[in-house]
């Protein structure tokens, strides 16, 4: 076949409708005794049959959930300590709960922060991001 005849063939194929292309595919499969389906890839079975474990998050957020009225001053001091906020901002953080005290922090820092808040009388928790 010459380059010219190949270009003509490509042009004709480009003008076929989806239905015509489907029929052409079937005819070629029959003529050449092949299938145009994607090959199936076999996946090796795992040894234990256990589900894959999700990767543990590396960043955490600490949430201040509740502060009893009689513990507010102690919690306020801890919030200032762990966030570095001024008194006014720390006070606002302890009102209208729940509020995120820290974001994108390590697990050990999140655990320490929650422990300090709980020791001061607040209800706090952390979760992975």
UniProtKB/Swiss-Prot annotation:
The keyword Ribosomal protein applies. It comes from the Bacteria. One of its GO terms (cellular component) is cytosolic large ribosomal subunit. Keywords: Ribonucleoprotein, Ribosomal protein. InterPro entries: Ribosomal_bL12 (IPR000206), Ribosomal_bL12_C (IPR013823), Ribosomal_bL12_C/ClpS-like (IPR014719), Ribosomal_bL12_oligo (IPR008932), Ribosomal_bL12_oligo_N_sf (IPR036235). The keyword Ribosomal protein applies. One of its GO terms (molecular function) is mRNA binding. Residues 94-113 are annotated as: Disordered. GO terms for biological process: translation. Belongs to the bacterial ribosomal protein bL12 family. Forms part of the ribosomal stalk which helps the ribosome interact with GTP-bound translation factors. Is thus essential for accurate translation. Homodimer. Part of the ribosomal stalk of the 50S ribosomal subunit. Forms a multimeric L10(L12)X complex, where L10 forms an elongated spine to which 2 to 4 L12 dimers bind in a sequential fashion. Binds GTP-bound translation factors. This is Large ribosomal subunit protein bL12.
């Amino acid at each position: 076949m010459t380059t010219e005849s190949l270009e003509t063939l490509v042009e004709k194929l480009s003008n076929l409708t989806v239905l015509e292309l489907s029929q052409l595919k079937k005819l070629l499969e029959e003529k050449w005794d092949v299938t145009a389906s994607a090959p199936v890839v076999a996946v090796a079975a795992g040894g234990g049959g256990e589900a894959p474990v999700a990767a543990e998050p590396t960043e955490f957020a600490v949430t201040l959930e509740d502060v009893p009225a009689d513990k507010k001053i102690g919690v306020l001091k801890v919030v200032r300590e762990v966030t570095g906020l001024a008194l006014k901002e720390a006070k606002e953080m302890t009102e209208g709960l729940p509020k995120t005290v820290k974001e994108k922090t390590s697990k050990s820092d999140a655990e320490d922060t929650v422990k300090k808040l709980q020791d001061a009388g607040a209800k706090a928790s952390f979760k992975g991001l």
